[in-house]
Amino acid sequence: MAKRTWLGDVLKPLNSEYGKVAPGWGTAPLMAVFMGLFLVFLLIILELYNSTLMLEGVNVNWTALGS
């Protein structure tokens, strides 16, 4: 039999819902929305790095960052 520890006793409530599945889609649509927003964020960063997205007054000089 497994030894009981204080950490196991603290974490047990987090595992009390094991095996139970919410009916339907649950929070999957909300997760998809946040994944889409994260994708847009990454695309904006990529375009800034690639200099394909130009912002007025923002000078991106990557060589200056290295020195």
UniProtKB/Swiss-Prot annotation:
The keyword Cytoplasm belongs to this UniProt entry's keyword annotation: no
Annotated SUPFAM superfamilies: Photosystem II 10 kDa phosphoprotein PsbH
Transmembrane segment boundaries: 26-46
Any GO MF annotation of the entry: phosphate ion binding
Database matches in InterPro entries: PSII_PsbH (IPR001056), PSII_PsbH_sf (IPR036863)
Pfam families named in the record: PsbH (PF00737)
Function: One of the components of the core complex of photosystem II (PSII), required for its stability and/or assembly. PSII is a light-driven water:plastoquinone oxidoreductase that uses light energy to abstract electrons from H(2)O, generating O(2) and a proton gradient subsequently used for ATP formation. It consists of a core antenna complex that captures photons, and an electron transfer chain that converts photonic excitation into a charge separation.
PANTHER family: PHOTOSYSTEM II REACTION CENTER PROTEIN H (PTHR34469:SF4)
Entries under NCBIfam families matching the protein: PRK02624.1 (NF002728)
The protein, known as: Photosystem II reaction center protein H
Chain's gene name: psbH
